[in-house]
């Protein structure tokens, strides 16, 4: 069986890896790569059928446009646009829960949609308003422009050019939202699906001090591609992050840890291979600062509630708090776990992805 992308990443970075990185890699192989590989071998025939079925489910339903989101309870939706220039402004929608005001500022979650989606469809898939209302969070949903990408994918695979411009534009929009709405600026997290997940990780590494936590659902590992062809290979698990880019990221972190990280990914994802999740975990571990207190490895646990899909949860903790969490969803294709029915890239049978994310973000202090 070929090595995982995570293992390839460490092989590529071997010459520049520190002793700390090598120790963490051994932990990664022992606690994620090896048990997962053994599990995949035991379930090879079952997984092949599951991938086919999951892909059909992910592509069924409505992609976009969807009906504009409406608040069916307290709180309100607002919409607008931000930015100018050759890449065109970006539309956005923002949900503000009741009770959030200048004296009672709320944490904010930035949700980045995947290819082919828009803010309305992604709000519907994730049930953003209902979950945010219950949790008391502001939710900001930026929308990619079809002028910037014909499929409305965030350009995570162009890190030195258009992708960097988009990351800067998104960061400016986030800061504007913090100024214009009752947001606790030190409690901003970002989470995305697919291309949005890769862009969320990109934002977390470009602007580490601005995010309390970051998350990717079914996203590619960032800095693994510089064009669309390379992006396709990365999504298949055939490319890892560029060693020079990773070295630059380490320098940019200047001795800081990257923000706490949540990774959610289905093991039946035929569009973005699950190995991207292990590669992203390995990247985060490699970027731990020299001399930092080592992360503690928590034994993997399996969770299943009722008839929902089972998940395997892998945690690394900093002190008593989780720092990195990888959630493998059994039988999930390229779709939002626990999403609303009737939409593409949404699997109602999985555990609620947005609730899982908010639980993690709250646990790390976001």
What function would you assign to each model-found segment?
Residues 1-108, 120-121, 191-195, 199, ...:
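A domain-start/cap signature at the N-terminus of enzymes
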Residues 263-265, 269:
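Short beta-strand/loop motif that positions the catalytic acidic residue
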Residues 271-276, 337:
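Conserved alpha/beta-hydrolase "acid-adjacent" motif
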Residues 191, 215-218, 264, 329-330:
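Alpha/beta-hydrolase-fold catalytic nucleophile elbow
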């Amino acid at each position: 069986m070929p090595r995982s992308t995570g293992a390839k990443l460490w092989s590529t970075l071997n010459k520049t890896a520190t002793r700390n990185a090598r120790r963490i890699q051994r932990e990664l192989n022992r606690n994620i790569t090896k048990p997962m590989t053994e599990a995949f071998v035991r379930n090879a025939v079952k997984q092949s059928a599951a991938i086919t079925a999951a892909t059909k489910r992910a592509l069924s339903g409505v992609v976009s446009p969807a009906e504009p989101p409406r608040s069916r309870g307290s709180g309100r939706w607002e919409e607008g646009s931000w930015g100018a220039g050759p890449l065109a402004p970006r539309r956005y929608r923002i949900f503000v829960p009741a009770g959030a005001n200048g004296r009672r500022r709320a944490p904010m979650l930035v949700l980045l949609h995947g290819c082919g989606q828009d803010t309305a469809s992604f709000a519907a898939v994730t049930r953003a308003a209902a979950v945010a209302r219950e949790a008391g969070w502001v939710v900001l949903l930026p929308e990619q422009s079809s002028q910037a990408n014909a499929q409305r994918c965030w350009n995570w695979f162009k890190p030195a050019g258009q992708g960097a411009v988009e990351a800067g534009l998104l960061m400016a929009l986030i800061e504007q939202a913090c100024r214009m709405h009752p947001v606790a600026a030190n409690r901003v997290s970002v989470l995305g699906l697919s291309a949005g997940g890769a862009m969320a990780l990109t934002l977390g590494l470009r602007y580490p001090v601005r995010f309390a936590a970051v998350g990717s659902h079914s996203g590619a590992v960032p800095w693994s591609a510089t064009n669309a062809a390379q992006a396709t290979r990365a999504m298949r698990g055939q490319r890892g992050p560029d060693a020079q880019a990773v070295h630059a990221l380490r320098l940019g972190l200047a001795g800081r840890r990257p923000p706490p990280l949540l990774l959610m990914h289905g093991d039946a994802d035929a569009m973005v291979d699950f190995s991207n999740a292990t590669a992203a975990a390995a990247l985060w571990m490699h970027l731990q600062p020299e001399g930092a207190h080592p992360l503690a490895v928590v034994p993997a646990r399996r969770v299943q509630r009722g008839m929902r899909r089972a998940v395997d949860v892998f945690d690394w903790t900093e002190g008593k708090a989780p720092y990195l969490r990888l959630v493998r969803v059994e039988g999930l294709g390229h779709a939002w776990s626990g999403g609303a029915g009737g939409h593409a890239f949404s699997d109602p049978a999985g555990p609620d992805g947005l609730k899982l994310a908010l639980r993690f973000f709250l646990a790390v202090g976001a």
